[in-house]
């Protein structure tokens, strides 16, 4: 709590001669707006889960896993966050930049990319050399994966289907593909529990910005699209959970403004609103202070709408 917040809270409580309530609310604030206390749990699938300690000390598990387990016999391709390819726990490295570039591009689409599209995206302006770079990248990627998996020379990990190159789904399990599939399910499944499950899977898979660390121009719109989907997932999850399990909604939103988009006023305003519904006014104040700090990072300030939400809650 900042000094001005502390003075305001103390003055309000003393005016009502409620010293005990002051202590209780301060404890609640520290539990609610501080960094989430994470405890590791094991899921049935062998994944590492995340349990968040609620204000009362009880563990409210939101089962947001830090990683996914690849299907048996498949390489695990993680591109939500820093890109990483592994097979049975061993990291797979590419010998050449063009193979790494091709893998990054193909990992963004299970349907693959046309030959012309690959060359225009990765090696535009190279003329005939672009075609040679593509074939070299395909050979390198196939070779690296054969060595990692121990399969025969006839196995192709990059296949050509109707003039489109794609990662063979039989051999790759890509977190972005799962993320997109879960996104589709959020709009097709019936029932609150099924929607929460799909939204939860999206948030668990989203470790960070798509292909984090790559500054290629072609990545940027795809990165923004994935981030928007994750923000929407957090918002929908919180709205579905706020009535029956508001603490869970708060936990998810706090993780979302850390992991997904620290500058999303939609998430911050929803977080403050639910904190306000729970009567946690110091938490609302702290959330607004954090919002101001995050916006300052990009030389901005909270919008008039965000300030209105805050002022309405504080009264």
Where are these regions (language model features)?
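Short boundary/linker motifs that mark transitions into or out of structured domains
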Residues: 2-99, 156-164
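DNA-binding patch around the recognition helix
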Residues: 77, 92, 137-170, 296-302
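Short aromatic/basic micro-patch
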Residues: 79, 112, 173
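DNA-recognition element of transcription regulators
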Residues: 82, 95-104, 128-149
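Conserved RecA-like P-loop NTPase ATPase core
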Residues: 85, 118, 141, 202, ...
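Short amphipathic alpha-helical recognition elements used for nucleic-acid or partner binding
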Residues: 90-122, 141
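Intrinsically disordered, charged and Pro/Gly-enriched terminal/linker segments
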Residues: 108, 126-132, 162-315
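Short N-terminal amphipathic alpha-helices
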Residues: 114-117, 121, 129-131, 153-156
């Amino acid at each position: 709590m900042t000094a001005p917040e502390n003075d305001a809270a103390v003055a309000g409580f003393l005016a009502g001669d409620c010293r005990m309530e002051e202590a209780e609310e301060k404890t609640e604030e520290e539990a609610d707006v501080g960094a989430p206390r994470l405890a590791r749990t094991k899921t049935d699938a062998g994944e590492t889960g995340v349990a968040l300690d609620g204000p009362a000390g009880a563990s409210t598990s939101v089962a947001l896993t830090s990683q996914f387990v690849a299907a048996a016999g498949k390489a695990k391709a993680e591109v939500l966050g820093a890109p990483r390819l592994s097979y049975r726990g061993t990291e797979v490295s590419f010998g050449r930049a063009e193979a790494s570039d091709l893998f990054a591009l193909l990992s963004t689409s299970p349907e693959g990319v046309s030959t012309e599209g690959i060359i225009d995206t990765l090696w535009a302006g190279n003329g005939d050399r672009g075609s040679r770079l593509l074939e070299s990248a395909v050979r390198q990627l196939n070779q690296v994966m054969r060595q990692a998996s121990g399969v025969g020379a006839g196995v192709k990990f990059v296949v050509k289907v109707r003039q489109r190159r794609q990662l063979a789904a039989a051999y790759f399990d890509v977190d972005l593909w799962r993320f997109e599939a879960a996104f589709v399910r959020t709009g097709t499944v019936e029932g609150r529990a099924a929607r929460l499950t799909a939204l939860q899977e999206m948030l668990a898979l989203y470790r960070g910005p798509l292909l984090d660390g790559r500054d290629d121009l072609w990545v940027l719109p795809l990165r923004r699209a994935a981030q928007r989907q994750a923000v929407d997932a957090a918002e929908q999850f919180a709205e579905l959970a706020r009535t029956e399990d508001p603490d869970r909604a708060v936990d998810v939103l706090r993780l979302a403004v850390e992991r997904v988009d620290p500058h999303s006023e939609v998430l911050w305003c929803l977080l403050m609103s639910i904190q306000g519904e729970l009567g946690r006014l110091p938490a609302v104040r702290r959330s607004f202070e954090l919002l101001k700090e995050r916006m300052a990072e990009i030389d901005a300030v909270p919008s008039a709408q965000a300030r209105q939400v805050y002022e309405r809650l504080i009264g």
